[in-house]
Amino acid sequence: MYHSELFQQYGTSYTMRPPHALAPTYPSAGGHHDSYRYSELDVPSQRFDGLFPALEPSQRILGAPPLTPLSLPPGPALGFGQVQPPCETPQLPGNVKMKLENKELWKQFHSIGTEMIITKSGRRMFPQCKVSVSGLEADGKYLLLADLLPVDNSRYKWQEDHWEASGRAEPRLPERVYIHPDSPAPGSHWMKQPISFHKIKLTNNTLDQMGHIILHSMHKYQPRFHIVRAQDVFSRRWGGCSSFTFPETLFLTVTAYQNEKITQLKIQTNPFAKGFREDGMKSKRDRSIRGKRKVISVEQEQEEEEQFQPEGECKRPPLYSGPCDSTLSEELDIGRSLGIPSPNCSFHPITPPTQTPPSTETPNPSLPANQEQGAPLQMSSQTPGTFLQTYPEPPRGASSLYSCSPTDAAQNQTLRPSAQRLPPGYQESPHISHSQGELKIYGTEMGPPGNFNPPSCAVTPSVRLSDEPMGRGFSMNFPHFLPNNKIGLQISGAQLQRMYNGGGWM
């Protein structure tokens, strides 16, 4: 629009210019909406009829309408909880039959009330669905499908010893169809042997992306099987479909078995539950564990009895039990192989009767040099601190307890510890053989208290000359205090100084 007072030369109004006339060869307006057909491209349909026998005549020429998407045969609209009837048209020939192979097993479960476990990750069914078919064309292509339909519109609960309805069912979930992995296959393949649907997995995960069949817990479901002819799969019509159901296969979905009879029946019939049987591996493991526990309890009772036995009847403890097992582990291992006589009761130090030094008497030749004569020592419990307080100073004649000589001191200081051998004055038992790994390290002889120049000295007792206990107050039942043995107690000079100056043991 424009203002008439500004453009007076155009007047108060004006008319539109008429449209230009189109050329006579220009297509009419109807040609813009209808597809243009070139006659030279039209192909006679009868020329290629033999190549496409399954295609419809409307699809054999160019310009035919596009194919519709492939879909299952349409069925009637169903309300909530209504069972979908099997597909009606088209039907396979009436001679196509399906039979449930493990029907007797299903009947056993059905008489009690079959329960199927469902999990988030998916659980297989037992009993499995095993069917056999007959009446198919040997050369025809067929697909076998399976799905699960809700039986009614109720939710169930286990009440004492039976199932009963407890309310309305949950809203129906998207129905999923399980396609047998052998599909499509010729009819001869399906009819030659039973068909198993053991790979079907049930889940309660509504967001499952693994293709498992989604079900609600505590609901009744009915498996349904379909045989679909797949020869004309690219056509707008299916070749035929037949559906089959078996009343014995009805089951309830649970997350844990509610009926104890179902649990026992599945243990007896499921080959994968052999471990739960009385003769199964799980029962054997349980029995073996119970047996081991009994043995352990008996051993514990024996140990408790040994701990409360009197002193005269107590047995020798193991070499690694005692106050010195942490520092003499290697020496005790050597002493075990030397046949050292065992002590009468324990390794605890005894109370010294007197503070007199050991006497020297002629030993009894009828006894070995490394065994005690007379009655066993009376053992009494005493702490190491009390024992050291009794002997603040070394006893008289203590120099005979050490195998160090002044002449060997300088040599031992210059030699490496690995090269220091037994001193010349040491008499070794002829029954004991030498070995490279059983060497002793010796230092020099002890001097007066406080003058301990050598860095270390091996305490080794001299040969006994009397049948009295050597060094009264010293337990001669220790392996490292026995004469003519190969065990040397490595003690540094500073430790010996503190020991005899009253500074405490070690």
Swiss-Prot record:
Tissue-by-tissue expression: At gastrulation, expressed in the lateral and ventral mesoderm. Expressed around the blastopore except at the dorsal midline. As gastrulation proceeds, expression extends anteriorly and ventrally. At the tailbud stage, expression then retracts caudally becoming restricted to the tip of the tailbud.
InterPro entries assigned to the protein according to its UniProt record, in alphabetical order: p53-like_TF_DNA-bd_sf (IPR008967), T-box_DNA-bd (IPR046360), T-box_sf (IPR036960), TF_T-box (IPR001699), TF_T-box_CS (IPR018186)
Positions of the DNA-binding region: 105-278
Pfam family, one: T-box
Bias-annotated ranges (Low complexity): 357-368
Molecular function via GO: DNA-binding transcription factor activity, RNA polymerase II-specific; RNA polymerase II cis-regulatory region sequence-specific DNA binding
Gene3D superfamilies registered for this protein in UniProt: Transcription factor, T-box
Annotated PANTHER family: T-BOX PROTEIN-RELATED, T-BOX TRANSCRIPTION FACTOR TBX6
Protein name: T-box transcription factor TBX6
Classification of source organism: Eukaryota, Metazoa, Chordata, Craniata, Vertebrata
